[in-house]
Regions:
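Intrinsic low-complexity, intrinsically disordered segments enriched in polar/basic residues
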Residues: 1, 54, 58-59, 143-147
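An amphipathic alpha-helical interaction segment
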Residues: 120-174
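Intrinsic disorder/low-structure terminal segments
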Residues: 4, 67, 170-173
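Short Lys/Arg-enriched alpha/beta "domain-start" segment
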Residues: 1-11
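N-terminal regulatory/effector-sensing and dimerization cores
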Residues: 10-118
Length: 174
């Protein structure tokens, strides 16, 4: 079933409202019409998240889960507590960092191949493996304090995006 979207008149470039929503102390929270101007990486530690996109995709994930949402789409997002309090963090990924990761995976590693097809989805999901949560937290905290160089940030982004590279849609979304 497709839902009708009424995007907000103001584009949300920095999705700070989603970042600060975690502090609202509610059992569930819905935000509608968020326009993603950049790709977003979400680390869902606990809780449940449901996302409906403007293209009609419906995504449901429970923590712990890593979620990649491609840019240039409008989403409706609902977050809920499950047995534990909702806990998530997100990082906006600029296009240059994603392009650098794409080039690294495609040109420096011969065992990866990029399909030449248009993606049918605009999201990727991956369970949070050992070390991924720590790298995500390091990158998340460094974005706030600006304590890492751009080269180190891009290296950490490549590490995080490597969780998705075996998905058929990954290269088309990067």
């Amino acid at each position: 079933m497709l839902k009708v979207f009424n995007p907000s008149p103001v584009q949300v470039g920095s999705i700070e409202c989603l970042q600060s929503a975690q502090n609202w102390q509610r059992k569930s929270l819905s935000l509608q019409g968020l326009n993603l101007l950049q790709s977003v990486l979400i680390k869902l530690t606990t809780g449940k998240i449901s996302i409906t996109t403007s293209s009609g995709e419906y995504i449901t994930a429970s923590g712990p889960m890593l979620i990649f949402l491609a840019k240039d789409q409008t989403i409706h997002i609902t977050m809920e507590e499950t047995h534990e309090q909702l806990n998530y963090h997100l990082i906006e990924l600029d296009s240059a960092s994603i392009k650098n990761a794409y080039n690294f995976f495609l040109y420096e590693h011969a065992d990866f191949s990029a399909p030449l097809t248009k993606p049918t989805t605009k999201h990727l999901l991956a369970p949070i493996e050992t070390g991924v949560a720590r790298v995500f937290n390091l990158l998340h905290s460094s974005n706030k304090s600006q304590k890492l160089s751009q080269d180190k940030k891009e290296y950490l982004i490549r590490f995080l995006l490597s969780e998705f590279i075996y998905e058929p849609e990954a290269f088309a979304l990067f």
